Amino acid sequence: MKLIILEHYSQASEWAAKYIRNRIIQFNPGPDKYFTLGLPTGSTPLGCYQKLIEYYKNGDLSFQYVKTFNMDEYVGLPRDHPESYHSFMWNNFFKHIDIHPENTHILDGNAADLQAECDAFEEKIQAAGGIELFVGGIGPDGHIAFNEPGSSLVSRTRVKTLAMDTILANARFFDGDLAKVPTMALTVGVGTVMDAKEVMILITGAHKAFALYKAIEEGVNHMWTVSAFQQHPRTVFVCDEDATLELKVKTVKYFKGLMLVHNKLVDPLYSIKEKEIQKSQSAKKPYSD
């Protein structure tokens, strides 16, 4: 397990974006080899998405051979509703990059058979070869996707009733009107995310500090679903200073002492422009008789 500690939200977002960029480029995706990326919604990943868009616009990164799978979607909210996760992903990420729409996968909260929709989502992930890198965020209570306190740590994609705390927290997106807030959602399970080859969790802000403490310094507990990722062989937690406020000083010092090593994951920062130059140079073989 790696814990990446940066001073500010913007730095944490940039580190995460650089990591995604390097992972995609090093994977060397192509028509017969897609990079599969799990993605979250919410305010936490916005900074990361903005940097990824910047990399694409600068010609350093392409999503042409990337398939994405989103974590969750509300039940009963029209797809074009401004607060649907379809709208969120399109407006904040997908429409700004070169990803093909058919390679983006988001659960349909208006499907006639919701559980069949969840089962089909799991099948699509398997058909794509599994998730190479699943990026997630958490709530103050440590929930990932809509796997709220008490969720099974081996759960799969399913229909979930939302906790009142989540409904209250989401009311700000619906004009403060609780009657407008969806009470159910479709969500990947903890087990679904655990099946990914690698997991990166973004945790920023003092209001997430206790959840990070539970994830790092205490044991695995279904009341704090983020703690399950202690048992994943390749977990990267990326946080800002504010999110570490509940951690022991020696814990923070220990992981900061590893930053020289961990920063090698994003330095050097790879670019598809450089790869194209290398390809063209290798294609120009010197004359020999």
From Swiss-Prot:
Record GO terms (molecular function): glucosamine-6-phosphate deaminase activity; isomerase activity
Modified-residue entries (Phosphothreonine), positions: T161
Quaternary structure, from the entry: Homohexamer.
Annotated catalysed reactions: alpha-D-glucosamine 6-phosphate + H2O = beta-D-fructose 6-phosphate + NH4(+)
Localization (cell): Cytoplasm
Official protein name in the record: Glucosamine-6-phosphate deaminase 1
Presence of the UniProt keyword Hydrolase in the record: yes
